[in-house]
Regions:
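Short glycine/serine- and small hydrophobic-enriched flexible loop segments
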Residues: 61-65, 127-131
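Short beta-strand and adjoining strand-loop segment in the mid-core
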Residues: 1-13, 43-51
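Conserved Rossmann-fold dehydrogenase catalytic segment
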Residues: 21-49, 68-87, 96, 100-116, ...
């Protein structure tokens, strides 16, 4: 996603095209985007779309693990089946793989602190979307979730105070998994 001076791009584009990813036809995925900063802006928008999908996947896994009481193996198998049902996505595929990752005998996810940081790109993207009257609720929810996750001490204190525990759902698991899949698909 190069941008800036056209003459400079013309000088380096042969090298960029050699190292760039290729599309299904073998053409390099490189094109001049525009003036200074345009490439960064496009990358920011791209990242914000992924940011929203990652949050949706986090919520999907959370609902399946704590609401449906599925194991990581069952969740992984379910997500992999979705990729064969028209929901092909790199993030979906790697999430299914990450769910099975272990360190020793323990699942890696059980060792990860439930606290995410942020550098500001999600907030910048959200501010820009709002400025131009573009609604993208997965991004706004992702930014909010990251803010909340950063307040781990407060979250734990409130959970203790209110005694909140995520209870299992009472409906049929097959029906609920289909509803979760449809909600995930809707956000994409």
């Amino acid at each position: 996603m190069p941008s800036g001076n056209q003459e400079a791009y013309d000088l380096v584009s042969p090298y960029l095209k050699k190292i760039a990813a290729k599309d299904n036809n073998g053409a390099p995925c490189v094109s001049f985007i525009g003036n200074s900063g345009a490439g960064h802006f496009i990358k920011m928008v791209h990242n914000s779309i992924e940011y929203g999908e990652m949050q949706t996947l986090a919520e999907t896994v959370h609902l399946m693990k704590f609401g449906l009481k599925l194991s990581y193996t069952e969740i992984s198998r379910t997500l992999k089946s979705w990729t064969n049902e028209g929901l092909k996505s790199y993030l979906l595929e790697i999430t299914a793989d990450i769910l099975l990752a272990k360190e020793g005998k323990n699942f890696l996810l059980d060792q990860v602190l439930d606290k995410a940081g942020q550098k500001g790109t999600g907030s910048w993207s959200l501010t820009t979307a709002l400025k131009y009257n573009v609604a993208y609720s997965p991004l706004s929810e992702a930014v909010t979730a990251r803010m909340l996750s950063g307040n781990k001490d407060e979250r734990e204190e409130l959970a203790t105070f209110f005694g909140h525990r995520f209870g299992a759902f009472g409906e049929d698991k097959v029906i609920l998994i289909e509803k979760i899949k449809n909600a995930y698909a809707l956000t994409r």
